[in-house]
Amino acid sequence: MDSTVTLFQTRQPESIKLYIETSGSMNGFFRANKPTNFKKTVWSAFSGMAHKTDGKVYPMSNGGDIDTPVILGDFRRKMNAGQFVSNFSTHIPAMLLNIIQNIDTTKNEVAVLVSDMKYSPMGESAATELLQYQEQIRNIIGYNPNVSLSFVCATSEYLNKDGSMAEEKSPYIFLIMGNSENVAALRNDIARWCEATDSYVESGDMAMEYHTPSYEIREVKNGLLSPTYPRNLITTYDREVSDTCSFIIRINMNGFPWTAVDSEIIKDALTAKSVYGSSVDVELLTEQDHLVDDHAYQRNFERRSYADYLIKLYNVAMDDEVIEWNFTNQPIDGRYFVDFNNMITVTDENDLSGLFSFNKFLDGVVNARLNTSDKEPVRILVSSYQ
Protein backbone atom coordinates (compact mmCIF):
# COMPACT_ATOMS: atom_id res chain seq x y z
CA MET A 1 0.00 0.00 0.00
CA ASP A 2 1.06 3.59 -0.70
CA SER A 3 4.04 2.54 -2.81
CA THR A 4 4.29 6.04 -4.29
CA VAL A 5 5.46 7.56 -1.00
CA THR A 6 9.22 7.82 -0.45
CA LEU A 7 10.12 7.78 3.25
CA PHE A 8 13.08 9.90 4.32
CA GLN A 9 15.56 8.38 6.76
CA THR A 10 19.06 9.44 7.66
CA ARG A 11 21.75 7.15 6.29
CA GLN A 12 25.43 7.24 7.11
CA PRO A 13 27.68 7.97 4.11
CA GLU A 14 29.87 5.26 2.65
CA SER A 15 32.86 7.60 2.38
CA ILE A 16 33.82 11.12 3.49
CA LYS A 17 36.32 13.65 2.16
CA LEU A 18 37.66 16.18 4.65
CA TYR A 19 38.55 19.73 3.59
CA ILE A 20 39.75 22.71 5.61
CA GLU A 21 40.24 26.32 4.58
CA THR A 22 43.72 27.71 5.27
CA SER A 23 43.58 31.44 4.64
CA GLY A 24 44.47 34.63 6.45
CA SER A 25 41.03 35.00 8.02
CA MET A 26 41.39 31.54 9.61
CA ASN A 27 44.78 32.26 11.22
CA GLY A 28 43.37 33.10 14.65
CA PHE A 29 42.03 29.56 14.93
CA PHE A 30 45.37 28.01 13.93
CA ARG A 31 47.87 29.98 16.08
CA ALA A 32 50.68 27.77 17.40
CA ASN A 33 50.99 26.17 20.81
CA LYS A 34 47.74 27.48 22.20
CA PRO A 35 44.82 25.15 22.91
CA THR A 36 41.57 26.36 21.36
CA ASN A 37 38.11 24.91 21.07
CA PHE A 38 38.55 25.00 17.30
CA LYS A 39 41.48 22.57 17.42
CA LYS A 40 39.72 20.36 19.94
CA THR A 41 36.41 20.24 18.07
CA VAL A 42 37.84 19.88 14.57
CA TRP A 43 40.08 17.04 15.66
CA SER A 44 37.21 15.37 17.52
CA ALA A 45 35.06 15.51 14.38
CA PHE A 46 37.79 14.55 11.91
CA SER A 47 39.04 11.64 14.00
CA GLY A 48 35.44 10.52 14.52
CA MET A 49 34.94 10.40 10.76
CA ALA A 50 38.38 8.97 10.00
CA HIS A 51 37.18 5.40 9.39
CA LYS A 52 35.08 6.64 6.45
CA THR A 53 37.86 8.75 4.86
CA ASP A 54 40.93 8.02 2.75
CA GLY A 55 43.03 8.97 5.78
CA LYS A 56 43.74 12.45 4.46
CA VAL A 57 42.71 16.08 5.00
CA TYR A 58 42.65 18.41 2.00
CA PRO A 59 43.68 22.01 2.81
CA MET A 60 42.26 24.73 0.57
CA SER A 61 43.96 28.05 -0.15
CA ASN A 62 45.31 30.17 -3.03
CA GLY A 63 41.91 31.31 -4.25
CA GLY A 64 40.07 28.03 -3.69
CA ASP A 65 42.45 25.36 -4.94
CA ILE A 66 42.68 21.95 -3.31
CA ASP A 67 46.22 21.72 -1.96
CA THR A 68 48.43 18.69 -1.35
CA PRO A 69 46.60 16.41 1.09
CA VAL A 70 47.87 15.92 4.63
CA ILE A 71 47.83 12.54 6.38
CA LEU A 72 45.25 12.72 9.16
CA GLY A 73 47.78 12.06 11.94
CA ASP A 74 50.11 14.73 10.55
CA PHE A 75 47.18 17.12 10.28
CA ARG A 76 46.70 17.17 14.04
CA ARG A 77 50.39 17.84 14.66
CA LYS A 78 50.56 20.57 12.04
CA MET A 79 47.37 22.20 13.29
CA ASN A 80 48.65 22.31 16.87
CA ALA A 81 52.01 23.68 15.68
CA GLY A 82 50.38 26.52 13.74
CA GLN A 83 51.60 25.28 10.36
CA PHE A 84 48.31 26.17 8.68
CA VAL A 85 48.72 29.88 9.40
CA SER A 86 48.61 31.44 5.94
CA ASN A 87 48.87 34.67 3.97
CA PHE A 88 46.69 33.33 1.16
CA SER A 89 43.11 34.33 0.52
CA THR A 90 40.40 31.99 -0.69
CA HIS A 91 37.50 32.46 -3.09
CA ILE A 92 34.46 30.67 -1.67
CA PRO A 93 32.66 30.03 -5.00
CA ALA A 94 35.82 28.45 -6.46
CA MET A 95 36.37 26.46 -3.28
CA LEU A 96 32.77 25.23 -3.28
CA LEU A 97 32.84 24.26 -6.96
CA ASN A 98 36.13 22.37 -6.61
CA ILE A 99 34.74 20.36 -3.72
CA ILE A 100 31.37 19.59 -5.32
CA GLN A 101 33.01 18.42 -8.54
CA ASN A 102 34.93 15.84 -6.51
CA ILE A 103 31.90 14.32 -4.72
CA ASP A 104 30.53 11.03 -6.06
CA THR A 105 27.00 11.08 -4.68
CA THR A 106 26.16 7.86 -6.57
CA LYS A 107 28.45 6.10 -4.08
CA ASN A 108 27.01 7.91 -1.03
CA GLU A 109 30.11 10.05 -0.69
CA VAL A 110 29.98 13.23 1.40
CA ALA A 111 32.37 16.17 1.65
CA VAL A 112 32.94 18.21 4.82
CA LEU A 113 34.55 21.66 4.68
CA VAL A 114 35.68 23.58 7.76
CA SER A 115 35.75 27.30 7.03
CA ASP A 116 34.80 30.69 8.43
CA MET A 117 32.88 31.16 5.13
CA LYS A 118 33.86 34.82 4.91
CA TYR A 119 33.76 36.43 1.49
CA SER A 120 35.26 39.90 1.84
CA PRO A 121 35.52 42.00 -1.33
CA MET A 122 37.27 45.32 -0.90
CA GLY A 123 36.80 48.85 -2.21
CA GLU A 124 33.95 50.74 -3.83
CA SER A 125 32.66 47.68 -5.68
CA ALA A 126 32.31 45.58 -2.51
CA ALA A 127 28.50 45.83 -2.31
CA THR A 128 28.11 44.86 -5.96
CA GLU A 129 30.54 41.97 -5.59
CA LEU A 130 28.61 40.62 -2.60
CA LEU A 131 25.46 40.48 -4.73
CA GLN A 132 27.42 38.78 -7.49
CA TYR A 133 28.76 36.34 -4.90
CA GLN A 134 25.19 35.40 -3.98
CA GLU A 135 24.44 34.77 -7.67
CA GLN A 136 27.59 32.67 -8.07
CA ILE A 137 26.51 30.44 -5.20
CA ARG A 138 23.04 30.16 -6.75
CA ASN A 139 24.50 29.06 -10.07
CA ILE A 140 26.82 26.45 -8.55
CA ILE A 141 24.04 24.83 -6.53
CA GLY A 142 21.55 25.15 -9.38
CA TYR A 143 23.87 23.32 -11.77
CA ASN A 144 24.48 20.50 -9.29
CA PRO A 145 21.00 19.22 -8.38
CA ASN A 146 22.42 16.00 -6.93
CA VAL A 147 24.05 17.87 -4.03
CA SER A 148 22.30 18.89 -0.81
CA LEU A 149 23.97 20.89 1.94
CA SER A 150 23.87 21.31 5.68
CA PHE A 151 25.88 23.46 8.03
CA VAL A 152 26.86 23.26 11.67
CA CYS A 153 28.04 26.47 13.31
CA ALA A 154 30.45 26.32 16.24
CA THR A 155 32.54 28.87 18.13
CA SER A 156 36.11 28.99 19.38
CA GLU A 157 38.72 31.31 20.79
CA TYR A 158 40.34 33.43 18.08
CA LEU A 159 43.92 34.46 18.87
CA ASN A 160 46.12 37.41 17.96
CA LYS A 161 49.65 36.88 16.61
CA ASP A 162 51.09 37.12 20.13
CA GLY A 163 48.69 34.45 21.39
CA SER A 164 46.43 36.85 23.26
CA MET A 165 42.67 36.58 22.97
CA ALA A 166 41.14 38.55 20.12
CA GLU A 167 37.65 37.04 20.45
CA GLU A 168 36.43 34.49 22.97
CA LYS A 169 33.66 33.04 20.79
CA SER A 170 34.42 33.44 17.11
CA PRO A 171 32.15 31.39 14.80
CA TYR A 172 33.12 29.01 12.03
CA ILE A 173 31.26 26.48 9.91
CA PHE A 174 31.27 22.78 9.13
CA LEU A 175 29.72 22.66 5.63
CA ILE A 176 28.43 19.20 4.65
CA MET A 177 27.68 18.31 1.01
CA GLY A 178 26.23 15.17 -0.59
CA ASN A 179 22.96 13.21 -0.78
CA SER A 180 20.21 14.50 1.51
CA GLU A 181 20.06 11.31 3.62
CA ASN A 182 23.84 11.20 4.08
CA VAL A 183 24.10 14.92 4.77
CA ALA A 184 21.40 14.78 7.46
CA ALA A 185 23.10 11.86 9.23
CA LEU A 186 26.49 13.54 9.26
CA ARG A 187 24.98 16.86 10.33
CA ASN A 188 23.63 15.14 13.44
CA ASP A 189 27.03 13.62 14.21
CA ILE A 190 29.01 16.83 13.75
CA ALA A 191 26.49 18.82 15.78
CA ARG A 192 26.90 16.29 18.59
CA TRP A 193 30.70 16.58 18.47
CA CYS A 194 30.34 20.36 18.71
CA GLU A 195 27.88 20.04 21.58
CA ALA A 196 30.33 17.77 23.42
CA THR A 197 33.00 20.51 23.33
CA ASP A 198 30.47 23.17 24.37
CA SER A 199 30.92 25.00 21.07
CA TYR A 200 27.65 24.26 19.23
CA VAL A 201 25.63 27.27 18.05
CA GLU A 202 23.26 26.24 15.25
CA SER A 203 22.67 23.90 12.34
CA GLY A 204 20.57 24.17 9.20
CA ASP A 205 19.77 22.44 5.93
CA MET A 206 19.79 23.70 2.34
CA ALA A 207 18.60 22.22 -0.96
CA MET A 208 17.40 19.11 0.87
CA GLU A 209 14.90 16.56 -0.43
CA TYR A 210 13.03 15.52 2.71
CA HIS A 211 10.37 13.50 0.85
CA THR A 212 8.03 12.19 3.59
CA PRO A 213 9.59 11.58 7.00
CA SER A 214 9.65 8.04 8.30
CA TYR A 215 6.74 7.43 10.68
CA GLU A 216 4.83 4.86 12.67
CA ILE A 217 1.23 4.58 13.88
CA ARG A 218 0.79 4.08 17.63
CA GLU A 219 -1.86 3.91 20.36
CA VAL A 220 -4.89 3.14 18.18
CA LYS A 221 -8.18 3.55 20.04
CA ASN A 222 -11.37 1.98 18.67
CA GLY A 223 -9.57 -0.04 16.03
CA LEU A 224 -6.70 -2.46 15.43
CA LEU A 225 -3.48 -1.71 13.62
CA SER A 226 -2.89 -4.17 10.79
CA PRO A 227 0.25 -6.28 11.32
CA THR A 228 0.53 -6.67 7.54
CA TYR A 229 0.20 -2.97 6.72
CA PRO A 230 1.20 -1.23 9.97
CA ARG A 231 1.75 2.13 8.27
CA ASN A 232 -1.48 2.29 6.30
CA LEU A 233 -4.35 0.19 7.67
CA ILE A 234 -6.52 0.28 10.80
CA THR A 235 -9.29 -2.33 11.01
CA THR A 236 -12.34 -3.16 13.18
CA TYR A 237 -13.36 0.46 13.75
CA ASP A 238 -16.70 0.21 15.58
CA ARG A 239 -19.02 3.24 15.50
CA GLU A 240 -21.29 1.61 18.09
CA VAL A 241 -18.44 1.60 20.60
CA SER A 242 -17.47 5.21 19.87
CA ASP A 243 -17.96 7.76 17.15
CA THR A 244 -14.23 8.47 17.26
CA CYS A 245 -11.21 6.48 16.12
CA SER A 246 -7.96 8.03 17.32
CA PHE A 247 -4.30 7.19 16.90
CA ILE A 248 -0.86 8.79 17.03
CA ILE A 249 1.37 9.38 14.03
CA ARG A 250 4.94 9.45 15.32
CA ILE A 251 7.12 11.47 12.93
CA ASN A 252 10.82 10.58 12.92
CA MET A 253 12.57 13.97 13.28
CA ASN A 254 16.14 12.65 12.94
CA GLY A 255 16.33 14.02 9.40
CA PHE A 256 15.68 17.61 10.45
CA PRO A 257 17.97 20.14 12.19
CA TRP A 258 17.90 20.31 15.98
CA THR A 259 16.10 23.65 15.95
CA ALA A 260 13.09 22.03 14.27
CA VAL A 261 12.04 20.01 17.31
CA ASP A 262 10.07 22.86 18.83
CA SER A 263 6.33 22.87 19.42
CA GLU A 264 5.90 26.44 18.18
CA ILE A 265 7.67 25.63 14.92
CA ILE A 266 6.08 22.30 13.98
CA LYS A 267 2.63 22.51 15.58
CA ASP A 268 1.02 22.91 12.13
CA ALA A 269 3.59 20.99 10.07
CA LEU A 270 1.37 17.92 9.79
CA THR A 271 -2.00 18.35 8.09
CA ALA A 272 -4.64 15.69 7.52
CA LYS A 273 -8.01 15.40 5.80
CA SER A 274 -10.51 12.68 4.95
CA VAL A 275 -11.33 11.53 1.44
CA TYR A 276 -15.04 10.78 2.01
CA GLY A 277 -16.08 13.72 4.17
CA SER A 278 -15.53 12.59 7.75
CA SER A 279 -14.12 15.02 10.31
CA VAL A 280 -10.39 14.89 11.14
CA ASP A 281 -8.60 16.76 13.93
CA VAL A 282 -4.82 16.99 14.30
CA GLU A 283 -2.98 17.94 17.49
CA LEU A 284 0.75 18.02 18.22
CA LEU A 285 1.33 16.42 21.61
CA THR A 286 3.83 18.47 23.59
CA GLU A 287 4.29 16.36 26.72
CA GLN A 288 7.86 15.28 27.46
CA ASP A 289 7.47 11.74 26.13
CA HIS A 290 5.72 12.88 22.94
CA LEU A 291 8.09 15.59 21.69
CA VAL A 292 11.62 14.25 22.02
CA ASP A 293 15.07 15.27 20.80
CA ASP A 294 17.75 13.25 22.56
CA HIS A 295 21.14 13.95 20.97
CA ALA A 296 22.86 11.06 22.76
CA TYR A 297 20.20 8.40 23.21
CA GLN A 298 21.05 5.96 26.02
CA ARG A 299 24.47 7.65 26.22
CA ASN A 300 25.35 6.38 22.77
CA PHE A 301 26.45 8.50 19.83
CA GLU A 302 22.97 8.38 18.38
CA ARG A 303 20.13 10.86 17.98
CA ARG A 304 16.59 9.85 18.93
CA SER A 305 14.07 12.45 17.87
CA TYR A 306 10.35 12.30 17.17
CA ALA A 307 7.12 14.28 17.30
CA ASP A 308 3.74 12.71 18.09
CA TYR A 309 0.58 13.99 16.40
CA LEU A 310 -2.79 12.84 17.72
CA ILE A 311 -5.27 12.13 14.91
CA LYS A 312 -9.00 11.98 15.68
CA LEU A 313 -11.43 10.68 13.06
CA TYR A 314 -15.16 11.19 13.73
CA ASN A 315 -18.53 11.87 12.06
CA VAL A 316 -17.87 8.85 9.86
CA ALA A 317 -20.82 8.11 7.58
CA MET A 318 -19.47 5.05 5.75
CA ASP A 319 -17.92 1.72 6.72
CA ASP A 320 -14.50 2.86 5.51
CA GLU A 321 -12.65 6.15 5.49
CA VAL A 322 -9.28 7.19 4.10
CA ILE A 323 -7.15 9.78 5.84
CA GLU A 324 -4.58 11.65 3.77
CA TRP A 325 -1.77 13.44 5.57
CA ASN A 326 1.31 15.46 4.68
CA PHE A 327 4.26 16.77 6.65
CA THR A 328 5.84 19.98 5.36
CA ASN A 329 9.30 21.35 6.06
CA GLN A 330 8.25 24.96 5.37
CA PRO A 331 7.80 26.05 9.03
CA ILE A 332 11.28 24.69 9.76
CA ASP A 333 13.30 26.34 6.99
CA GLY A 334 15.35 29.37 7.96
CA ARG A 335 14.34 29.25 11.64
CA TYR A 336 17.50 30.02 13.59
CA PHE A 337 18.32 31.01 17.15
CA VAL A 338 18.86 34.72 17.83
CA ASP A 339 22.58 34.28 18.49
CA PHE A 340 23.12 32.78 15.04
CA ASN A 341 20.99 35.42 13.33
CA ASN A 342 23.14 38.07 14.98
CA MET A 343 26.27 36.34 13.69
CA ILE A 344 25.18 36.21 10.05
CA THR A 345 23.97 39.81 9.94
CA VAL A 346 27.21 41.54 11.00
CA THR A 347 28.19 44.31 8.57
CA ASP A 348 31.88 44.60 9.44
CA GLU A 349 34.12 41.95 7.89
CA ASN A 350 36.58 42.44 10.77
CA ASP A 351 33.95 41.61 13.40
CA LEU A 352 35.33 38.35 14.80
CA SER A 353 32.06 37.63 16.61
CA GLY A 354 30.21 37.24 13.32
CA LEU A 355 30.05 35.30 10.06
CA PHE A 356 30.40 38.15 7.60
CA SER A 357 28.61 37.44 4.28
CA PHE A 358 27.39 33.96 5.28
CA ASN A 359 23.82 35.24 4.94
CA LYS A 360 24.61 35.91 1.26
CA PHE A 361 25.76 32.31 0.91
CA LEU A 362 22.54 31.03 2.49
CA ASP A 363 20.44 33.27 0.25
CA GLY A 364 22.33 32.08 -2.81
CA VAL A 365 21.58 28.44 -2.05
CA VAL A 366 17.92 29.20 -1.31
CA ASN A 367 17.62 31.07 -4.61
CA ALA A 368 18.92 27.96 -6.39
CA ARG A 369 16.85 25.27 -4.67
CA LEU A 370 14.52 25.26 -1.71
CA ASN A 371 14.25 22.41 0.76
CA THR A 372 11.38 20.25 -0.46
CA SER A 373 8.97 17.64 0.85
CA ASP A 374 6.71 15.38 -1.19
CA LYS A 375 3.26 16.66 -2.17
CA GLU A 376 1.88 13.13 -2.50
CA PRO A 377 0.00 12.40 0.75
CA VAL A 378 0.31 9.33 2.91
CA ARG A 379 -2.99 7.41 2.96
CA ILE A 380 -4.32 5.51 5.96
CA LEU A 381 -7.42 3.34 5.52
CA VAL A 382 -9.66 3.13 8.59
CA SER A 383 -12.08 0.24 8.10
CA SER A 384 -14.93 -1.22 10.12
CA TYR A 385 -14.06 -4.62 8.68
CA GLN A 386 -11.47 -7.03 9.95
Question: For each predicted feature, which ranges?
Answer:
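Acidic, serine/threonine- and glycine-rich low-complexity intrinsically disordered segments
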Residues: S148, S156, N160-H290
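Extracytoplasmic/secreted cell-surface and envelope-processing proteins
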Residues: M26-R31, D65-I71, Y119-L130, Y158-G163, ...
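Extended non-globular C-terminal regions
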Residues: L224-Q386
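VWA/integrin I-like adhesion module and closely mimicked acidic/polar interface patches used
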Residues: K118-M177
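Well-ordered, non-membrane alpha-helical segments in soluble/globular domains
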Residues: A32-A45, G82-N98, E124-I141
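Bacterial Sec-dependent signal peptides at the C-terminal "C-region" and cleavage site
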Residues: M1-Q9
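Von Willebrand factor
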Residues: Q9-S115, Y119-S120, S148-V152, T155
